[in-house]
Curated annotation (Swiss-Prot):
GO terms for biological process, alphabetical: aerobic electron transport chain
GO MF annotation terms: 4 iron, 4 sulfur cluster binding; electron transfer activity; metal ion binding
InterPro entries: High_potential_FeS_prot, HIPIP_sf
Alphabetic keyword roster: 4Fe-4S, Electron transport, Iron, Iron-sulfur, Metal-binding, Transport
Annotated family: Belongs to the high-potential iron-sulfur protein (HiPIP) family.
Domain of life of the organism encoding this protein: Bacteria
The keyword 4Fe-4S is assigned to this record: yes
Keyword field contains DNA-binding: no
Residues that hold [4Fe-4S] cluster according to the record: C22, C25, C40, C55
Function (record text): Specific class of high-redox-potential 4Fe-4S ferredoxins. Functions in anaerobic electron transport in most purple and in some other photosynthetic bacteria and in at least one genus (Paracoccus) of halophilic, denitrifying bacteria.
Gene: hip
Pfam family, one: HIPIP
Upper lineage: Bacteria, Pseudomonadati, Pseudomonadota, Betaproteobacteria, Rhodocyclales
The protein's name: High-potential iron-sulfur protein
Subunit-level organization: Homodimer.
Length: 62
């Protein structure tokens, strides 16, 4: 499912922004494969986060 309220709060989008994307973010919880949808530590209850997406909570993965 998705968490529409939290997605909106963080301005989530399904596309990368300035080269930043969910798969490169410390908050992203990867799905079954590198291209599969995953989860996010700041958007609870949402398992449809795109690896190539972006939101304002982006923190570069170390």
């Amino acid at each position: 499912g998705t968490n529409a309220a939290m997605r909106k709060a963080f301005n989530y989008q399904d596309t990368a922004k300035n080269g930043k994307k969910c798969s490169g973010c410390a908050q992203f919880v990867p799905g079954a494969s590198p291209t599969a949808a995953g989860g996010c530590k700041v958007i609870p209850g949402d398992n449809q986060i795109a690896p190539g997406g972006y939101c304002d909570a982006f923190i570069v993965k170390k």
